[in-house]
């Protein structure tokens, strides 16, 4: 609060017009395009879809909702085989039932979908790039509501778009909510509707390059200039 009195403005990713009595300059979380490679263009395969979630996994990522939905999907005959790949460290608390969410292991065992949920562990650089190249659709945060958050501009959403992959999330992100390659799902505890996700993906006709180009305004250069020009 004391520092706010001695600056011209406060730069924020939020929607607040004033913070600690000082005016704000609203920008978005930026993207360093030079450090994020564009994924390869894949021919659309109607018989198999590979989903990819990349995170240091916590309960607010809500991957249990995706696994639950996948289990329900496979309870009936499936024309499209769907795999869920998870790349990143996973807290032990996420693997078993907790006060926050059902455990991954419990859900996988309940539905007998062991071969459809693949844990890759932490991947970086070329190994991570290869996972993106083989993926069709990415999984963002599906449970930010569990930590009391609605509006947020996550780096992961921006990385997905910069790589050129369509994705799903449940929070409010003004930079992406109306993008044609975004599937929004309810911010609640319901299982993710895999059939809806499949339909959305199959009807989508956007190349990785077009997805990436849609967020050129989110480069750090553009966002920094926005802050400077509003001083």
Positions of the model-derived regions?
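Carbohydrate-associated surface elements
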Residues: 16, 30
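Membrane-proximal helix-turn-helix segments that form the acceptor-binding/catalytic region
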Residues: 1-10
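A charged, aromatic-enriched C-terminal amphipathic alpha-helix characteristic of glycosyltransferases
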Residues: 189-192, 202-231
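Nucleotide-sugar-dependent
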Residues: 61, 126-128, 138-159, 168-179
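Nucleotide-activated donor-binding/catalytic signature segment of Leloir-type glycosyltransferases, i.e.
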Residues: 88, 98-126
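Conserved donor-binding/catalytic core segment of Leloir-type glycosyltransferases
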Residues: 42-61, 66-70, 84-87
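Nucleotide-sugar donor-binding and catalytic loop/hinge architecture
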Residues: 33-50, 74-79
């Amino acid at each position: 609060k004391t520092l706010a009195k001695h600056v011209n403005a406060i730069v924020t990713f939020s929607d607040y017009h004033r913070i600690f009595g000082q005016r704000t300059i609203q920008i978005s979380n930026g993207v360093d395009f030079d450090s994020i490679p564009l994924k390869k263009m894949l021919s659309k395969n109607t018989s198999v879809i590979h989903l990819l979630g990349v995170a240091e996994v916590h309960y607010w990522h809500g991957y249990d909702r995706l696994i639950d939905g996948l289990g329900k999907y496979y309870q009936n005959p499936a024309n499209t085989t769907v795999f869920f790949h998870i790349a990143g460290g996973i807290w032990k608390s996420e693997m078993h039932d907790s006060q926050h969410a059902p455990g991954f292991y419990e859900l996988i065992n309940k539905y007998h979908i062991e071969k459809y949920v693949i844990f890759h562990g932490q991947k970086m650089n070329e190994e991570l790039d290869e996972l993106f190249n083989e993926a069709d659709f990415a999984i963002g945060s599906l449970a930010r509501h569990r930590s009391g958050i609605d509006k947020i501009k996550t780096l992961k959403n921006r990385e997905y778009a910069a790589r050129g992959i369509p994705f799903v999330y449940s929070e409010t992100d003004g930079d992406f909510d109306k993008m044609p390659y975004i599937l929004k799902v309810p911010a609640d505890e319901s299982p993710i509707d895999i059939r809806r996700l499949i339909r959305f993906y199959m009807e989508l006709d956007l190349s990785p390059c077009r997805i990436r180009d849609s967020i050129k305004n989110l480069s750090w250069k553009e966002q920094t200039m926005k802050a400077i020009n509003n001083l």
